[in-house]
């Protein structure tokens, strides 16, 4: 079903996906498009409205990302956020310059003219600013609706053409009434109608899967994580036992994870084949220390094992994947963005095995997949699982992977997670895990000098994993975890806690 969207034009903002998510939370379908998307393509999508995202560039710089000017002639309401406001100002004849006083962080917004965009919002409220450039001259037909101490053009509008600009970020939680302002733009200015409901999505997707697959068979490699599990449950609901699921144990799983995943997947009625390929993976990882090389070896071996097993299923024409909208957006990318890490999935498999891809969630965010899982009756313990990387513990052992170190890490990680759950902290963090470091340290245990391994604990808070802050866990709690690990895990005599945020660090160590 073709839904009328609110289009979010991406100028390279770290918040672009957050904007799209906020729109969907308000009940309207949103889609992200690149800033140089042709106007004809935008027109075809028949959007209710368009939101220009922020971005790191300066509109007056050479080669700055600027959309086709004909976008303003479509008669579609536009909202520019931060850099987006400056794009509108610059392209329509106003002036933007470098600000001598840059504005980052909380600011006080003061409304000076009433407008539908401020419906239900107090005269003064806190907003979040993040800009180094400023507007000094408005385009013809525009007026100022709100100001802040350092931004005399905090909210601008051409009311006749329904073009608005916010110098602040309404999508972040620090802007107290940001969601309400977005709702006012969507419903008050764009006159959009609600068209995004997870229950409707499930019914439509089941029909679509049935039509797409027909009498063919579908194969899936499941990890036990949220995305692949919910995708399998939805597909199984649509086509029954024409779906064949595989769980490959690569020997790099957490403590008792294989048994837990198998139990969970079978309890959901999924047709499952469990493959133990642990020796094969560990053999190929012998002597390998480089993290990128480890990821590649695991990815290649995974494909070989899965291909070998899947060939046993006659009539398989589709490969089910739990691809999400952020994966689609990131693979489209903003020109010039750098690859940070190789992502481990079954990439390359469809071509090799002559399979077509089935990606029921390619237009969804992770929180939406969780909502679907809930509606499909997937147990909370699966939906609340922390993300776990495809290469498993191999990228949490810094350096070469061997059975002894895997055993040490499994035990330490299990204690950490167990204590988080016991203390009611597990659901408060986005991800938590232990890392085994390639260093030894001197210690004293029972009056005897020791020289043993160091374990690092990592816990982060995040919304989508794209940015993350280290979790401020209570000292008493960390003390208890440290004592348990050192007393119960042979070969460890020191525990440290990682307090790095993303950026500059990544969540995983490798």
From Swiss-Prot:
Residues 5-195 form the Glutamine amidotransferase type-1 domain. GO terms for molecular function: ATP binding; GMP synthase activity. It is an enzyme of class 6 (ligase). One of its GO terms (biological process) is GMP biosynthetic process. Pathway: Purine metabolism; GMP biosynthesis; GMP from XMP (L-Gln route): step 1/1. PROSITE patterns: GATASE_TYPE_1 (PS51273), GMPS_ATP_PPASE (PS51553). Keywords: ATP-binding, Glutamine amidotransferase, GMP biosynthesis, Ligase, Nucleotide-binding, Purine biosynthesis. Its EC number is 6.3.5.2. InterPro entries: Class_I_gatase-like, GATASE, GMP_synth_C, GMP_synth_GATase, GMP_synthase, GMPS_ATP_PPase_dom, NAD/GMP_synthase, Rossmann-like_a/b/a_fold. It catalyses: XMP + L-glutamine + ATP + H2O = GMP + L-glutamate + AMP + diphosphate + 2 H(+). The keyword Ligase applies. It comes from the Bacteria. Pfam families: GATase, GMP_synt_C, NAD_synthase. The keyword Membrane does not apply. ATP binds at residues 223-229. One of its GO terms (cellular component) is cytosol. CDD domains: GATase1_GMP_Synthase, GMP_synthase_C. Homodimer. Catalyzes the synthesis of GMP from XMP. This is GMP synthase [glutamine-hydrolyzing]. It comes from Aquifex aeolicus (strain VF5). The lineage of its organism: Bacteria, Pseudomonadati, Aquificota, Aquificia, Aquificales.
